[in-house]
Amino acid sequence: MVKIRQFLLAILWLQLSCVSAAKNEVEQSPQNLTAQEGEFITINCSYSVGISALHWLQQHPGGGIVSLFMLSSGKKKHGRLIATINIQEKHSSLHITASHPRDSAVYICAVR
């Protein structure tokens, strides 16, 4: 009986998470971006409801989705990529320094 109860609680939690996520409006800008090699690029993401984490994802043409960053506060850096989040302002940015043709991809901001 205990195992069944834990399973049901997990299902309920997943359902509540989906409902909460459905009410959160996420806006990413710019929606399209063209840059010259070597430029500094910024992609912004705003959301309407408090979150536990924000993910920056990348998908190259014909490829799978890759997680770049998971943020709950502050700033993270990996190579030429920098991601920041401001929980109070409900805003995150992804910065690409010294852009390169291999950076051509779809960038996705996802919240939970």
Curated annotation (Swiss-Prot):
Residues 1-21 form the signal peptide. Keywords: Adaptive immunity, Cell membrane, Disulfide bond, Glycoprotein, Immunity, Immunoglobulin domain, Membrane, Receptor, Signal, T cell receptor. GO terms for cellular component: T cell receptor complex. Disulfide bonds join C45-C109. Residues 24-112 form the Ig-like domain. The keyword Transmembrane helix does not apply. It is found in: Cell membrane. Pfam families: V-set (PF07686). SUPFAM superfamilies: Immunoglobulin. Glycans are attached at N32, N44. One of its GO terms (biological process) is adaptive immune response. Alpha-beta TR is a heterodimer composed of an alpha and beta chain; disulfide-linked. The alpha-beta TR is associated with the transmembrane signaling CD3 coreceptor proteins to form the TR-CD3 (TcR or TCR). The assembly of alpha-beta TR heterodimers with CD3 occurs in the endoplasmic reticulum where a single alpha-beta TR heterodimer associates with one CD3D-CD3E heterodimer, one CD3G-CD3E heterodimer and one CD247 homodimer forming a stable octameric structure. CD3D-CD3E and CD3G-CD3E heterodimers preferentially associate with TR alpha and TR beta chains, respectively. PANTHER family: T CELL RECEPTOR ALPHA VARIABLE 39 (PTHR19339), T CELL RECEPTOR ALPHA VARIABLE 41 (PTHR19339:SF0). V region of the variable domain of T cell receptor (TR) alpha chain that participates in the antigen recognition. Alpha-beta T cell receptors are antigen specific receptors which are essential to the immune response and are present on the cell surface of T lymphocytes. Recognize peptide-major histocompatibility (MH) (pMH) complexes that are displayed by antigen presenting cells (APC), a prerequisite for efficient T cell adaptive immunity against pathogens. This is T cell receptor alpha variable 41. It comes from Homo sapiens. The gene is TRAV41.
